[in-house]
């Protein structure tokens, strides 16, 4: 597999050519349509951004409503609420919620989301492995900015790269030629 792409039980990791890594965790073999996404750009001081997505069940009493509060629980302790802003975009977690979840996911943890009468679970299986791989890809292992294997090493971490710019090339004297079946050029 490509160095920056991996699947770790219920978590996926994708790192792109700018050095940004995204890891997403899903429900554990149940049909709960929920995921948490953590995104971190390259660079020593880059923070981790957390987002929450709950897809519709198609059942009015179980679907999260726009404007409804979703409470996040880690090992039975409330991390506070997130307001569901839109069905078309993920809901942003606070910095405190993100840090608490990342810390909890380093070991076995239970993550639950509650709203109305509905409780959804996000799996912890594979999260620590995905975080370790993210640290490795971004060259953070044993540095203070590592998520998993923190240390005091001062080596440079992966610097953010600019997205490659693609220039469209103009073609001069364009002529359109229709090739018909049976013509010599058609068979090339």
Regions found by a protein language model. Give the residues of each.
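A generic "folded-domain core" signal
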Residues: 1-188
């Amino acid at each position: 597999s490509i160095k920056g792409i991996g699947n770790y039980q219920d978590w996926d990791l994708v790192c792109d050519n700018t050095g940004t890594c995204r890891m997403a965790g899903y429900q554990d073999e149940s049909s709960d349509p929920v995921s948490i996404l953590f995104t971190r750009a390259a660079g020593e001081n880059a923070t981790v951004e957390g987002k929450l997505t709950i897809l519709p069940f198609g059942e009015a009493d179980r679907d999260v409503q726009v404007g409804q509060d979703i409470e996040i629980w880690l090992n039975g302790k409330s991390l506070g609420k997130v307001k569901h802003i839109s069905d078309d975009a993920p809901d942003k977690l606070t910095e405190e919620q993100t840090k608490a979840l990342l810390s909890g996911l380093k070991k076995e943890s239970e993550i639950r989301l509650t709203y109305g009468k509905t409780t959804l679970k996000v799996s912890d299986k594979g999260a620590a492995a995905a975080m370790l791989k993210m640290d490795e890809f971004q060259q953070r292992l044993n540095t203070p900015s590592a998520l998993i294997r923190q240390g005091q090493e001062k080596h440079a971490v992966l610097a953010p790269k600019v997205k490659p710019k693609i220039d469209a090339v103009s073609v001069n004297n364009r002529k359109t030629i229709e090739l018909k079946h049976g013509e010599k050029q058609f068979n090339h």
